[in-house]
Amino acid sequence: MARITVEDCLAEVGNRFLIVQMAIKRVKQYREGYSPLVESKNKEIVTALREIAATKVLPESYHTADGKKPGSE
């Protein structure tokens, strides 16, 4: 079983407090009926951290180095 930690997510987000907020929000979305974006047989919080580490979920204020949001032209 692969382990996921907040440190795994820090490389993508950079702020541990934001990671926790993102994970909590994602767990609430699961409970509202949203489907997970990664395959996981773990608890909801671990699945949320896996999504963050895989950059399937990004913070709303996320911008690239050029100041644009990913995917915006």
From Swiss-Prot:
GO function term, MF aspect, one: DNA binding
InterPro entries: DNA-dir_RNA_pol_omega (IPR003716), Pol_omega/Rpo6/RPB6 (IPR006110), RPB6/omega-like_sf (IPR036161)
A biological process term (GO) from this entry: DNA-templated transcription
Any matching Pfam family: RNA_pol_Rpb6
Reactions listed under catalytic activity: RNA(n) + a ribonucleoside 5'-triphosphate = RNA(n+1) + diphosphate
Keyword Cell wall biogenesis/degradation found: no
Keyword annotations of the record: DNA-directed RNA polymerase, Nucleotidyltransferase, Transcription, Transferase
Keyword Nucleotidyltransferase included in the entry's annotation: yes
EC class name: transferase
One term under GO cellular component: DNA-directed RNA polymerase complex
EC number in record: 2.7.7.6
Family: Belongs to the RNA polymerase subunit omega family.
Record-linked PANTHER family: DNA-DIRECTED RNA POLYMERASE SUBUNIT OMEGA
Annotated function: Promotes RNA polymerase assembly. Latches the N- and C-terminal regions of the beta' subunit thereby facilitating its interaction with the beta and alpha subunits.
SUBUNIT field: The RNAP catalytic core consists of 2 alpha, 1 beta, 1 beta' and 1 omega subunit. When a sigma factor is associated with the core the holoenzyme is formed, which can initiate transcription.
Protein's UniProt name: DNA-directed RNA polymerase subunit omega
Organism this protein belongs to: Maridesulfovibrio salexigens (strain ATCC 14822 / DSM 2638 / NCIMB 8403 / VKM B-1763)
Gene label: rpoZ
